[in-house]
Amino acid sequence: MEYLPYIATSIACIVILRWALNMMQWLWFEPRRLEKLLRKQGLQGNSYKFLFGDMKESSMLRNEALAKPMPMPFDNDYFPRINPFVDQLLNKYGMNCFLWMGPVPAIQIGEPELVREAFNRMHEFQKPKTNPLSALLATGLVSYEGDKWAKHRRLINPSFHVEKLKLMIPAFRESIVEVVNQWEKKVPENGSAEIDVWPSLTSLTGDVISRAAFGSVYGDGRRIFELLAVQKELVLSLLKFSYIPGYTYLPTEGNKKMKAVNNEIQRLLENVIQNRKKAMEAGEAAKDDLLGLLMDSNYKESMLEGGGKNKKLIMSFQDLIDECKLFFLAGHETTAVLLVWTLILLCKHQDWQTKAREEVLATFGMSEPTDYDALNRLKIVTMILNEVLRLYPPVVSTNRKLFKGETKLGNLVIPPGVGISLLTIQANRDPKVWGEDASEFRPDRFAEGLVKATKGNVAFFPFGWGPRICIGQNFALTESKMAVAMILQRFTFDLSPSYTHAPSGLITLNPQYGAPLMFRRR
């Protein structure tokens, strides 16, 4: 018995030693091995720094850049502001260099053909594993791989078909009219008024997704949207700690608040979905909102898969909750970003504002622009939206990671464990495709369609590409066309003297100091 303490101590020492060796493998030996493999291929980047890699320097440079707005009058070369570290890497080493995300190297890919290839090869270049903080915001379709992704995509697709989008036009209309009427009340009959449109547009798109997702229980949807906005701010404030193992489980004030907000979101969504489930089981028809369409698709597909017999549903109760959260995050944020930069650029380019208004008035007069087919015939408005998406994509880069086996991407041989950042913003401005004026606002590039604009190349990635292209892009574009048309019918607008150009954002490309514009009634 007297040997037991020595045995226990020996076992503890072995466990600690094994843990230490594993940590050294992860934090030192493996990064150095990967660095050698990347440099052998001519890829360049900074030498690996223990644990943090390039993250400290990247964060410092970004904070410095975001501390001041861009000079006025502004141009569209804002990448050095939102990601100065990567901008310096690209200038120093050229396209296809690498940086260190902690102990993981990430190759920066900006050449359009390589971006397209990586998007298309979704089974090899997968989404990185979601950290616990980000998972609180949204998992669902965007985070799934393989068979689960395919099944969920198949179930969600019908909700975004054209005939279903047409059913959501009243939800779009109601929310847009509400905001435009609020603006009109602020503008005197024969004068002008300054309105910061950014809060209004985020509220508008949140309102739209609340109505489109939950229909008759819109009030619950609105409350969920408000809580998700709070949760997003909490997550962003805590992301800097996400590299610390187990940090989210510590009893900090931020973690406690985040848990409470998440529990309330979960409770509200459970109630809404449970009530819908009971109604469907009682024989009521599925609602024509996103949740109703999704639940109906889930039931029908599950029955088909089960040969018509009562079978376990493909999408679980929690899966439905996760997809609803994703509807909110993706559905409101990306559209608000598209709308705000569209209005800002139309302020700067008054000639295009005039052309777009003339087209809207020729198509709708002063009638509400609620005809889906007529909205899609707005050629100039569509050209403008495409050019805004090219210059100010809602998401400027997308991360992927190779988990299994060595593979080639173009001439690069990428070993497993290496990340890649697909710099869609760089591909959208490649001078070889778009010309030397690639950073200038020129909607007429799209006058003869996308294929002509890109000279037959695939070099336009505002919604991603390939099998995982954004499922809600037509939803966002229809909502945006209607909102822009209605605003052009009611107002002329210009930049306020207080406007400062400051694109920023960790997730989407937001105006850091808002978007104060001067409005006049027409």
UniProtKB/Swiss-Prot annotation:
Q: Where does this protein act, in terms of pathway?
A: Secondary metabolite biosynthesis; terpenoid biosynthesis
Output one GO BP term: triterpenoid biosynthetic process
Q: Which UniProt keywords apply?
A: Coiled coil, Glycoprotein, Heme, Iron, Membrane, Metal-binding, Monooxygenase, Oxidoreductase, Signal-anchor, Transmembrane, Transmembrane helix
Q: Which domain of life is it from?
A: Eukaryota
One example of the protein's molecular function in GO is: heme binding
Instruction: State its cofactor.
Output: heme
Topologically, how does it sit relative to the membrane? Single-pass type II membrane protein
Q: What is its EC number?
A: 1.14.14.-
Q: What applied role does this protein play in biotech?
A: Soapwort saponins possess anticancer properties and are also being explored as enhancers for endosomal escape in targeted tumor therapies. They may also serve as precursors for vaccine adjuvants.
Q: In UniProt terms, what function does this protein have? A: Component of the oleanane-type triterpene saponins (e.g. saponarioside A and saponarioside B) biosynthetic pathway, leading to the production of natural products with detergent properties used as traditional sources of soap.
Give the similarity note: Belongs to the cytochrome P450 family.
Name used for this protein in its record: Echinocystic acid 23-monooxygenase
- Organism this protein belongs to: Saponaria officinalis (Common soapwort)
